[in-house]
Structures are given as C-alpha cells and as structure tokens.
Amino acid sequence: GSPGLIPFGRS
C-alpha cells in the first residue's frame, strides 16, 4: 500500500 507512512493496504 503506502510507502511506510500509513499501513494502507498492508494487511
């Protein structure tokens, strides 16, 4: 997902 900032899409 996002580049480490927010765990968006990092299930």
From Swiss-Prot:
Modified residues (Serine amide): S11
InterPro entries to which the protein is assigned, alphabetical: Periviscerokinin
Pfam families in alphabetical order: Periviscerokin
Role of this protein: Mediates visceral muscle contractile activity (myotropic activity).
Gene Ontology cellular-component annotations: extracellular region
Keyword Transmembrane in annotation: no
Subcellular location(s) per record: Secreted
Keywords linked to the UniProt accession: Amidation, Neuropeptide, Secreted
Statement: the UniProt record of this protein carries the keyword Secreted: yes
Species this protein is from: Pycnoscelus surinamensis (Surinam cockroach)
UniProt record, GO biological process: neuropeptide signaling pathway
Family: Belongs to the periviscerokinin family.
Protein name in UniProt: Periviscerokinin-1
Tissue and organ distribution: Expressed in abdominal perisympathetic organs and abdominal ganglia.
